[in-house]
Amino acid sequence: LGVKVCEPGERHKESYKSAGLAAAAGGITTIVTRPDTTPAIDSPEALEFVTRRAQADAPVNVLPIAALTKNREGREMTEIGFLMDAGAVAFSDCDHVVENTKVFSRALTYARSCGALVIAHPQDPGLSQGAAATSGKFASLRGLPAVSPMAERMGLDRDIALIEMTGAKYHADQITTARALPALERA
């Protein structure tokens, strides 16, 4: 979930103007943008900057997602309440997994108290480190470093347990394997 706009940081790759024009050309009127920029959208000031830029340059509505943890490093949660006041519609560290269960649990608890949605990439980071694809025929034929589908399942199991504990609103981003479906069906 989310459009990768590279402002601030790497505007030459994708700007609010170019992303907005592409969306409008396809008949899309609203885009939701990710916080994985350089620097990350992890403070009200950074969010206000991108909001002003989007309003000035994008021909479509822009709804920003803010980072769940500072610099998307998984060590310290962001100011979720202040970021919501500044316009964040959800919180995510994108493809970075918040490995520390205590930090993730606290962030989910705080997000629940604010009514915020958390979007996470369920993955066991130890099993998925260095992988470029899910194990299988595609990865084997191309000689790609692969990760077991169980890494996604294990990450999702952890996230579901924390959601049950905290009652937070949660969206699992990038489910790529059927092995994760039993966990989703139970949830």
What is each stretch, according to the model?
Residues 9, 40-43, 73-76, 100, ...:
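Alpha-helix N-cap/helix-start motif
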Residues 1, 26-29, 57-62, 85-88, ...:
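Short coil/turn connectors at secondary-structure junctions
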Residues 1-57:
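Metal-associated gating/positioning segment near the N- to mid-region
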Residues 1-14, 35-37, 63-76, 142-150:
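Active-site mouth loops of central-metabolism enzymes
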Residues 35-40, 66-69, 95-97, 172-176:
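Conserved short loop/turn motifs at secondary-structure junctions
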Residues 44-65, 109-120:
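Alpha-helix-loop-beta-strand connector modules within alpha/beta enzyme cores
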Residues 1-3, 31-33, 62-66, 90-93, ...:
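Hydrophobic faces of well-ordered beta-strands that scaffold small-molecule active sites
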Residues 77-187:
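Histidine/acidic residue-rich metal-binding segments in metalloenzymes
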